[in-house]
């Protein structure tokens, strides 16, 4: 069964802007990142990232086609 596993290539992206936090407890960061390799090199995406992240961090993306929805305004 282990021989049937298919590995997918990951593409590096640099965090260029941290837009905000989302999730029930704020554990998800919404970031804008610039793709550094692959067919979408230079494209800027909005993605949700779990865990601590800061400007200039490199993240590895399994796919570059999907983009996160913009965060809505917070209600009080």
From Swiss-Prot:
InterPro entries: NA-bd_OB-fold (IPR012340), Ribosomal_eS28 (IPR000289), Ribosomal_eS28_CS (IPR028626). Coiled coil: none annotated. Transmembrane segments: none annotated. Keywords: Ribonucleoprotein, Ribosomal protein. It holds the Pfam family Ribosomal_S28e. GO terms for molecular function: structural constituent of ribosome. Signal peptide: none annotated. The keyword Ribosomal protein applies. GO terms for cellular component: cytosolic small ribosomal subunit. One of its GO terms (biological process) is maturation of SSU-rRNA. Belongs to the eukaryotic ribosomal protein eS28 family. This is Small ribosomal subunit protein eS28. The lineage of its organism: Archaea, Methanobacteriati, Methanobacteriota, Methanomada group, Methanococci.
